[in-house]
Regions:
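Conserved N-terminal segment of class I S-adenosyl-L-methionine
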Residues: 1-108, 120-123, 194-207, 213-220, ...
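A short glycine-rich, Lys/Arg-flanked "PGG" loop and its adjoining helix->strand segment in the class I
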Residues: 121-135
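A SAM-dependent methyltransferase catalytic signature shared across enzymes that methylate proteins
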Residues: 176-193
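Short catalytic micro-motifs in class I SAM-dependent methyltransferases
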Residues: 110-115
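Short N-terminal helix/helix-N-cap motif within the alpha/beta-hydrolase-1
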Residues: 117-121, 148
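Conserved class I S-adenosyl-L-methionine
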Residues: 138-160
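Acceptor-substrate binding/catalytic loop of class I
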Residues: 160-177
Length: 261
């Protein structure tokens, strides 16, 4: 079985986003590290969750007392998610103007940027929403993973229903290209965390505590050769001191207040 796809009894092609992209709560997953990036926040903070899916992360952050705003493209998925957020907007991320000014402590793009035609443009548009001391947390798949490299060596670049070569991915990232994009949007990457191959999804029986040493070893090896072995990268970045907010025209500003609907 290819480790680049997530096994399911039936094809996930055309499935709703909430079933295509399930919550990965297990240790060392991208969701594990995204949640951990905010674990030190004891007082409530303001979070903008961009691309909420079914609200997995928003539900946890809200339960912890944080103030969370959600943005989602898919209307059906949004209906499942909006109850976990103080405010919510269903919109196209390719054009959304982010009508906030220095409002959020964190902006999170969890498995989102690879689905956009121009992820750098989306990042630039969201930057005015971030407080001067705020952070952006991003997770993207690593197209330079050894599984994809081996497939290329064999003359294959086959899209899958899930995984690194998900059919819905429009952009592909290596660690270098991800860091370059953050530089282009005037952000400094302050932390990079690789995630190992999600063996718990490929082989569910490895969720047993018996396999904990195996997952510890797999993560340690992944950290040692992250550009080759990482399944995903989770980065934390902050705006540079010299970053200037762009001036938005009236046409770019949304016409209504963003509230839970």
């Amino acid at each position: 079985m290819s480790l680049s796809r997530m096994p399911k009894p039936a094809s996930a092609e055309g499935a709703p986003p909430e079933t295509r992209y399930e919550f990965k709560p297990f240790r060392y997953s991208s969701h594990f590290w995204i949640l951990k990036a905010l674990d030190h926040e004891r007082a409530p903070v303001k979070i903008l969750d961009v691309g909420t899916a079914a609200g997995y992360l928003g539900k946890i952050w809200t339960a912890r007392g944080h103030h969370v705003t959600g943005i989602e493209f898919d209307a059906a998925t949004a209906e499942k998610a909006r109850g976990y957020y103080e405010s919510f907007q269903v919109t196209d991320l390719e054009t959304f103007a982010f009508p906030y000014r220095r409002e959020f402590d964190y902006i999170v793009f969890a498995d989102v940027l690879e689905h956009l035609r121009d992820p750098a443009a989306a990042l630039r548009r969201c930057m005015p929403a971030l407080k001067e001391s705020g952070k952006i947390v991003i997770s993207v798949p690593n197209v330079a993973n050894w599984v994809v490299r081996l497939s290329l060596l064999l003359g294959k670049f086959d899209y899958m229903d899930r995984g690194i070569l998900d059919r819905t991915h429009l952009r592909f990232f290596t660690l270098r290209s991800l860091e370059k994009m953050m530089e282009e949007v005037s952000c400094d990457v302050v932390e990079v965390t690789p995630t190992p191959l999600p063996m718990q999804l490929v082989f569910p029986f490895t969720e047993s505590k018996f396999f904990a040493p195996f997952h510890e070893a797999l993560y340690a090896i992944t950290c040692g050769w992250k550009t080759l072995l990482a399944y995903q990268f989770v980065i934390t970045a902050g705006p540079r001191d010299s970053w200037q907010f762009p001036v938005l025209s009236e046409e770019m500003m949304p016409s209504r207040k963003l509230t839970k609907q």
